[in-house]
Amino acid sequence: MPFPCSRSPLSHVAASRRLLLAGAFCACALAAAPARAQEFALFGGLLAGGGGRSYAWAFDYQEGLGRYAAAGFAWYNEGHIPNHHRDGQAVQLWGRLPLRENRFVISAGVGPYRYFDTVAATEGRGYSNSHGWGMLMSVRAAYYTSHRWLAQLQVNRTQVFSGPNTTSLMFGIGYQLDAPDTPGPRDRAAGRAGRVTANEVTAMLGETILNSRRSPTALGGSLEYRRGIAKYVDWTATYLYEGAKQSVRRNGIASQVWLTRAFLDDKIALSAGAGAYLTLNERDIRGRPGEGDGRVSGIASISASYRFDDRWLARVTWNRVVTRYDRDTDVIQAGLGYRF
């Protein structure tokens, strides 16, 4: 069965929700005025590859390693080219050249790219979830204003081991989370004395999106315990309920390790994590045990929290469940937590 380039209206809504969540993470970062990190940006633009054209978007966190170097994390979405709906995460090492009294910066970055792709199935189902590795190479020109804001123009090139390579041109708006003494990028981020996190318990509700041709959704929830195990490292144990609709009927337990940064006198924290997800119960359309029942899958997540006081916090989390049986999901949830 041919795999169409265009998606159903429901899948376009799901894609819009993912983009809105990316904007929400950017909003959390931009709210962090006297922060302890460096730059956060949201990009959007056009992409070509695989015999077609589409959109592309990304959000990017970058931290200085000195005047001429930086490290960055990006969540990169390659849109909907023919037979492929691909996105993923990349960690890049950047070289940068400040010009014109640091107001204009030219930089180039490269790093591993872990991608997740919904593709046409060779047999059976109309789709399959393909995962793989590649490289993300980027060239960027950035202009720094006098008020922490920066405008960026960036070209990306993906080279993957299986699937089409793509090229995108994107425009981005960024914000410096750690205010520099003069316009331009900071050389390094400020340090901290103690751990970002002590102990937290958070209950969340939200939406589960099955990564298929139609992207059906279901209401889900979770209960998370989070503990700081090092200055910038958290560990979580989570019961994850993905929903009860026929298309998405799965629940399980996840264990993850997170890299975490705190801003605005520790009121806001951003983190990225990865780990394992054990399916306790999965049912198919007829209510019988599903293919994933009792299996271990991967899970990768990003999360943002706002701490109201010493005890209470709000959290939003985007989980990507990565399976080996074509049941990948995006689980996007928000809720209230307690610190102790």
Describe the role of every protein-language-model region.
Residues 53-57, 85-91, 131-137, 165-169, ...:
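Residues that define the transmembrane beta-barrel architecture of outer-membrane proteins
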Residues 35-81, 95, 103, 166-229, ...:
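Short glycine/proline- and aromatic-enriched beta-strand/turn motifs that initiate or cap beta-hairpins
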Residues 63, 95-99, 143, 157, ...:
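Residue-level signature of outer-membrane beta-barrel architecture
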Residues 46, 78-81, 123-127, 157-159, ...:
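Extracellular loop and loop/strand-boundary signature of outer-membrane beta-barrel proteins
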Residues 39-40, 67-73, 101-106, 143-153, ...:
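Repeated loop/turn-to-beta-strand initiation elements of outer-membrane beta-barrel proteins
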Residues 65-122, 222-287:
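Gram-negative (and chloroplast) outer-membrane scaffold detector with strong preference
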Residues 3-22:
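Bacterial N-terminal signal peptides that target proteins for export
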Residues 39-45, 72-76, 107-113, 152-156, ...:
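Transmembrane beta-strands of outer-membrane beta-barrel proteins
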